[in-house]
Amino acid sequence: MENWPTPSELVNTGFQSVLSQGNKKPQNRKEKEEKVEKRSNSDSKENRETKLNGPGENVSEDEAQSSNQRKRANKHKWVPLHLDVVRSESQERPGSRNSSRCQPEANKPTHNNRRNDTRSWKRDREKRDDQDDVSSVRSEGGNIRGSFRGRGRGRGRGRGRGRGNPRLNFDYSYGYQEHGERTDQPFQTELNTSMMYYYDDGTGVQVYPVEEALLKEYIKRQIEYYFSVENLERDFFLRGKMDEQGFLPISLIAGFQRVQALTTNLNLILEALKDSTEVEIVDEKMRKKIEPEKWPIPGPPPRSVPPTDFSQLIDCPEFVPGQAFCSHTESAPNSPRIGSPLSPKKNSETSILQAMSRGLSTSLPDLDSEPWIEVKKRHQPAPVKLRESVSVPEGSLNQLCSSEEPEQEELDFLFDEEIEQIGRKNTFTDWSDNDSDYEIDDQDLNKILIVTQTPPYVKKHPGGDRTGTHMSRAKITSELAKVINDGLYYYEQDLWMEEDENKHTAIKQEVENFKKLNLISKEQFENLTPELPFEPNQEVPVAPSQSRQGGVQGVLHIPKKDLTDELAQKLFDVSEITSAAMVHSLPTAVPESPRIHPTRTPKTPRTPRLQDPNKTPRFYPVVKEPKAIDVKSPRKRKTRHSTNPPLECHVGWVMDSRDRGPGTSSVSTSNASPSEGAPLAGSYGCTPHSFPKFQHPSHELLKENGFTQQVYHKYRRRCLSERKRLGIGQSQEMNTLFRFWSFFLRDHFNKKMYEEFRQLAWEDAKENYRYGLECLFRFYSYGLEKKFRREIFQDFQEETKKDYESGQLYGLEKFWAYLKYSQSKTQSIDPKLQEYLCSFKRLEDFRVDPPISDEFGRKRHSSTSGEESNRHRLPPNSSTKPPNAAKPTSTSELQVPINSPRRNISPESSDNSH
């Protein structure tokens, strides 16, 4: 048996075969095994054989070969298959054994095989160390043998050597070259126009050499596709960029990604389109040759913004000046859009394009890549009070409203008590202060309940106390007045909630009844639910039997839970059944049904707290104390400064939830305590009734001070009857009604009530009783300052002229004060009134000092009024009192602090200050 050839002989034989045939593939199995053996940690072939045979053994080379022969006797010999190589030398894989060793070892001698093997192994190892990243990517096995096979592990069991998609070749993707073939010159994409570049494949830039003629053909076909009928019918982006003649700038087309993948040279694009039959080029612009003017989409016309007078908008925090529209054309569609805001039409167009599929428009840039711009809306400021707002001319106001876009309301953070109050506001569906706009309907007048103080002398002197030596009936401080005002708010809310709670209580009772077993007749059942389709399993018929009570045949009906809810909603027209809201008036023994719907906001015990200042007051206290009149001191010519001043009373009001007109007089007593239920069991007739018990400290306060409530139309009828019975100027209740009108109409104007107020005031004035007329002038002065009405202002001027021409100064004083303190400065004043006002430059000019016997020159009367204090008429920059100002005179001790140095129009002070 002859000896096997040595590995060096096999290597030299393989090299000769490869060089002769031009093949660089591996030749035999021995060379492969040698490559595996060289990856060991030994430095030479002797060390490897020493480790295989064991340490300390000294064997010959022939024995080692015979040992290897015995081990490999059963293995088949590899037969090399020579294939022609089609790719160039520069594209050979550097990790391949043949490519790295064939050329350097071809000219070396065949002797000294071990030294050659060692040098070759070291060179391969150095290359692998320098190319760690390449080796790590090539194969899972970590060896170079199976780097690009389907399976790279095992000894020679790979399936192919470097076959497959060339894009998967790591060296090829990165343009890897041998050490001797590397160049230091970087690759310039812009200068090489005969290359096509493909991006974003996960490994880097792919470069494919293409002939210039073929590249021009690609460019021509791509751009002709953009201008084809098929693409233009759906490419609205491209058509929107066209001008009226259908031209597009070449820079726009060259900026598309598919064109950039072919070339970035504009000259090459122009050369490629010279012979085009679809596209023509004129002055670095291109368009479709056939019917080019058919495709452009006209853009929106430029928006013209009228000039804005910014001097009128200094105090308007919400005004944001607009910007004129200017068209913006981008040279690169992929760049972020930075410029003027788009028009509404372009915004809608952009949203449509974003919703389109990317396949519909090949020239459409990536709209999703644009950065989002967050626009934060400014918080809307709180509404400013009318007396503190600066008047703006109507023209500027209209211009301001037209220039601003409507803004949606934002949800702000709320505290628990604010959430509670919002829940209460939801119950006021028929009437609200904020929705009234200082107006009230005639129908709502029937819902007003007047709150007055029952005079103690009525029982002893039904005709009234005309002596003028009465004592103060109610000593109320300013804090208690606020508590009463808050209590009337809460009482009004109870009235509105009472109806809802009663309705829910009735519904719950009916629902509980339906959950019980009730014996009813068939006719009654059909009348109750004529439209509900009942299934057989929802009824349990029983045998006909005679009822003990009426002898009527009955049907025992057991409805289900969901049917009960549906039946309750159908019978009582209720969309929500809330058990927690109905439990307030149910006995404690009645079990509460399972909760079906979410409960409403539970009502908490009400405590005195500051109300919203924008709400109109409900209580008008008297703020003057009686004072002896000094007949020698200068004083105004008014009824309060007479020898027998009037007796003024506190008055308030609440808005009931039900219409209590002349035809409806029944009163619910569900909230009244047992001791107070008797007075309320009847009707709100001419006799006042005490308040029902409600959860607020002011309840006891109202009860202790003798406050009662009465329907407005009945209280008015009682006052008119007393005025007719006692005579003009002799009715104390009529004076209280005058005072109520003066306050109430300022916040809730009603034409019918105002005309009656004006008529009765002048009827009393003709009889030399001027209290009603003075209340009317106070309404004019303070009411117009709060809410200006042109027709009321004209009446104010007429009444003032009439009053001044009759020898009185009170009307002219109120008109002078209105002109001084009102924010409206544009109204036209009657020339006669201007002439009358020339003699009065300050408030002290209205003080006269006539003899007390000749002060009025007419019959004394006791119906006088409390007036507004001089301190409320001072300008904002004044802090001094007019000299010898009269102190307040009334029947109550109620001192209300001044909120601001400006003229105060609060009800606690305005009616009783001058």
UniProtKB/Swiss-Prot annotation:
Transmembrane segments: none annotated. It comes from the Eukaryota. Gene3D superfamilies: Winged helix-like DNA-binding domain superfamily/Winged helix DNA-binding domain. One of its GO terms (molecular function) is RNA cap binding. Keywords: Phosphoprotein, RNA-binding. The modification Phosphothreonine is found at residues 329, 427, 454. Residues 134-147, 599-608, 665-675 have a biased composition (Low complexity). The keyword Phosphoprotein applies. Residues 1-169, 327-348, 590-681, 852-914 are annotated as: Disordered. Residues 1-25, 876-914 have a biased composition (Polar residues). Residues 69-79, 148-164 have a biased composition (Basic residues). GO terms for cellular component: cytoplasmic stress granule; cytosol; nucleus. The modification Phosphoserine is found at residues 60, 327, 335, 340, 343, 432, 436. One of its GO terms (biological process) is positive regulation of translation. Residues 28-51, 84-95, 114-130, 624-633 have a biased composition (Basic and acidic residues). Belongs to the LARP family. This is La-related protein 1B. It comes from Homo sapiens. The lineage of its organism: Eukaryota, Metazoa, Chordata, Craniata, Vertebrata. The gene is LARP1B.
